[in-house]
Each structure stands twice: as C-alpha cells, then as structure tokens.
From Swiss-Prot:
The modification Phosphoserine is found at S49. Its cofactor is Mg(2+). Binds 1 Mg(2+) ion per subunit. Homodimer. This is Selenide, water dikinase 2. The modification N-acetylalanine is found at A2.
Length: 452
C-alpha cells in the first residue's frame, strides 16, 4: 500500500513538473551549424551506384556494437586492482576525497582501507595530476557506420566522443585523436572518396567544439570503424562529478530517443521482408524524416547542455548511448553517494519509432534498453531549476537545435533506476520536412555537408 501511494505521489509530481516545463516540442537545428540546407546524401554524387551503402561495410551499427552490459561487467572484473597494489588516488583534492573513474571504472577509497575499491562506472576517466590541483579527464569511443552519408558519419562519431566530457559539465576539450578503420572490402575509388569525407566531418565537429584533431591511428579492417579520444586538463570547478543526486531532483533529457530504430528502419526500406513487418504502422516518408531527424540529433554536440549544467546547479549526469536510457540510468544511479533511485516517467521518442519498435518486436525502446548513438544528456537537476533549464536551452542565443524534456525524478532508494510500467511517450516530430526539400549547394565534392 505504501509503495502504491508513493507511486501515485510520483505521478502527481511529474504532472506538475511537466506543466511547469511548458512546450514539449522541438526547437530547431544544431548550434554553430545549420542543417536547414541539408540535402539527403546521394551516392551518385560520388560516382557510386544509387544502391551503394556506407552501412554495408559493417555488420553492426553505431553504439549498437557495445558488448552487452552484463557481459561487459564480467569482462571488466579483470581490471580490478589487487589489494596489495598502491592506490590510484593521490589523496585529497579541494578537501574532499577524489573520485577516480578509470576507463569506465569508478574508484573510491574503501571504508577502513587505505586502498581504493573498484566498481563498474562511467565512461570518462578523471585522474588527479601530481601538480597544481589539476585533473586529467579523458574518454575514448568508436563504432561502426549507422548512416549512409560519410560526412555526417564523421560528425556523429566526433559528437559521440565529446559527449562523455560534456556529461561531466566540461565544455572545453584540449585535444582529440581520431581512430579510423578503412574497410578492406572497399575499392580504391571508394576509399579515396569516402575516407576524406568522414575525416572532414569528424574534424568539423571537433572545430565546432572548440578543439582540434592532432593525430590518431588509421588501419585497414574488414569493417569501417570511426571514433577517437578526447582529452582535457582542467580545474576541479570545471567539471561536475556524477555522484551527487539528491532526493527531489528532477531528471532532464536533452535529445529524443529512437536513433537506432530510425537507422534500422531506414535500411529496412530496401529489405522487403523486414519492411513488411512495419509498413502498417509507418510510411516510407515518415521513415525518411525520422532517419534524418535522428541523424541531425546525433550530429548535434551536447556542449550547450554541458555549460547549462553549471548555470542550473546540476548534481550528476550521463550521456545516453549503447545501453539505452535505462542501462545508463542504472549506471548513473550506482555512482551516487546518497541513497537514491531514479524513476523515469516520460520517454521523448522520435515520432513513429515507438510504433516500429512494437511492430518489429525488437529494440526494447519503451523498456529503455534500445541502444542510442550520440544521444542526449540525462541530467539530475534541482527541481526548482529543471523547467528553467528546459526553457533556457531552447533560447536562440545558443543557436538552433537544442531541446530538453523532464523525464523523471530522484527518490529515496537503493541506487537503482527503473521506468514505470506505462511511461508517457512524447512523440517528437521530425524537423526535416522542409530541410529535405530545400535546395543545397553543389555537394559533388563535399557530399552532404551542412552549411555554416
């Protein structure tokens, strides 16, 4: 009975918060660059057959390539440091015990012990440096193509790498490296045409983020792979550790879900067997628009949201990628110093993607387990700040393309996360109807690069 009453109270709380948030609709394109003149990629502009597909050079897509979460936890047990080894921490930083996240491992000094204990945690590492009260924050990510446009694939890959820094409220990146694998199945012509476009997309996104690509590694491999490393040295007040959520906080999401569904559905347009399973719930035009919406969202940096985390006193955050919103919420909940749990009530989803997920019997979108690529930030904000954050991020002064929704609350609990049985689905309408029809400059040499 007590549990039911608590659930009811949570529902009322969410209704009030959503009412305070105001408009739930999308608000345009990405900051720094406009996608309004984007023209859908056509392989013919590169001298390829109309049936040419970038995604044919890999067997998996985007962040869907991640090792399943439970399997990953077991594999990473091998990184646990033996008790006799010296600790990774360097003592106290700013009068507080420093939390170190090493390659997705959270390290905190164990109770009653001089040595840190290890647990699976977040994606960035935060390493206190020996001098000057500075910390090294570093992250790496790579994946396989999930869109057909090589230039946009490069942008998405870079945005995805930077997102781990942004999830910690870091807005500046000192350096990036690019990791690139060129498919050995490609012809020489394909390599010469496609590879420079992917590199240009990656570089342009890095420059939009105020950083530069200074090196990396390029190899030949059966599948195309693209990603990189992002590094920054910063003071403690420049980042927000993801461990300070408190009861009463509100969960805010800054990009809609459904990117992986949209990417797969777009490929199913050429696969009659799979298309027949979903054609009763979605039209070809709706799939094309959803795919374009997903692509633009994935290519949008989370940098503005990272800056606003400081303005509105965020307590913790993570980015939503390969483990879906539920998996990443659970990871974030495990990091919390306080005894709290996250409860998700609302799921902003690209229009029609929930219907496709149901009709296909795949993805688990409504269950929160569908992989996302270069997804939004899930941020724990003080309740009184959440609606203001959602309003502020849509301001034209940050450029176009940013949006946010209140999706859940932080309750007293045991560091877990869950989605309620019947979450409210917020259908996010694609913004690309006019963009798809707009005339774009000649892209025969630059593929479908967005305009500046």
């Amino acid at each position: 009975m007590a549990e039911a009453a608590a659930a009811g109270a949570s529902g009322e709380t969410m209704a009030a918060l959503v009412a305070a948030e105001g408009s739930l609709g999308p608000a345009g394109w990405s900051a720094g660059r406009s996608f309004s003149n984007y023209r859908p990629f056509e392989p013919q502009t590169l001298g390829f057959s109309p049936s040419w597909r970038l995604t044919s050079f890999s067997g998996m897509k985007g962040u869907g390539c991640k090792v399943p979460q439970e399997t990953l936890l077991k594999l990473l047990e091998g990184l646990t440091r033996p008790a006799l080894q010296p600790p990774l921490t360097s003592g106290l930083v700013g009068g507080q015990e420093e939390t170190v996240q090493e390659g997705g491992l959270s390290t905190r000094p164990g109770p009653g012990s001089a040595f840190p204990s290890l647990s699976i945690g977040m994606d960035s590492c935060v390493i206190p440096l020996r001098h000057g009260g500075l910390s090294l924050v570093q992250t790496t990510d790579f994946f396989y193509p999930l869109v057909e446009d090589p230039y946009m694939m490069g942008r998405i890959a870079c945005a995805n790498v930077l997102s781990d820094l942004y999830a910690m409220g870091i807005t500046e990146c000192d350096n990036m490296l690019m990791l690139l694998s060129v498919s050995q199945s490609m012809s020489e012509k394909e390599r010469e045409k496609v590879t420079p476009l992917m590199i240009k997309g990656f570089r342009d996104a890095a420059e939009e983020g105020g950083t530069a690509v200074t090196g990396g590694q390029t190899v030949v491999n059966p599948w195309i792979i693209i990603g990189g490393v992002a590094t920054v040295v910063c003071q403690q007040n420049e980042f927000i550790m993801p461990d300070s959520a408190v009861v009463g906080d509100v969960l805010v999401l800054t990009k809609p879900l459904g990117t992986q569904v949209a990417a797969n559905a777009h490929q199913w347009l050429d696969n009659p067997e799979k298309w027949n399973k979903i054609k009763m719930v979605v039209s070809r035009e709706e799939v094309e628009l959803a795919y374009q919406e997903a692509m633009f969202n994935m290519a949008t940096l989370n940098r503005t949201a990272a800056g606003l985390m400081h303005t509105f006193n965020a307590h913790a955050a993570t980015d939503i990628t390969g483990f879906g919103i539920l998996g990443h919420s659970q990871n974030l909940a495990k990091q919390q110093k306080n005894e709290v749990s996250f409860v998700i009530h609302n799921l902003p989803i690209i229009a029609k993607m929930a219907a496709i997920s149901k009709a296909s019997g795949r993805f688990g979108l409504l269950q929160g387990t569908s992989a996302e690529t270069s997804g939004g930030l899930l941020i724990c904000l003080p309740r009184e700040q959440a609606a203001r954050f959602c309003s502020e991020i849509k301001s034209s002064k940050y450029g176009e393309g940013h949006q946010a929704w209140i999706v859940g609350i932080v309750e007293k609990g045991n560091r877990t996360a869950r989605i309620i049985d019947k979450p409210r689905v917020i259908e996010v309408l694609p913004r690309g109807a006019s963009a798809a029809a707009a005339a774009a400059p000649d892209n025969s040499n630059a593929a479908s690069e967005p305009s500046s």
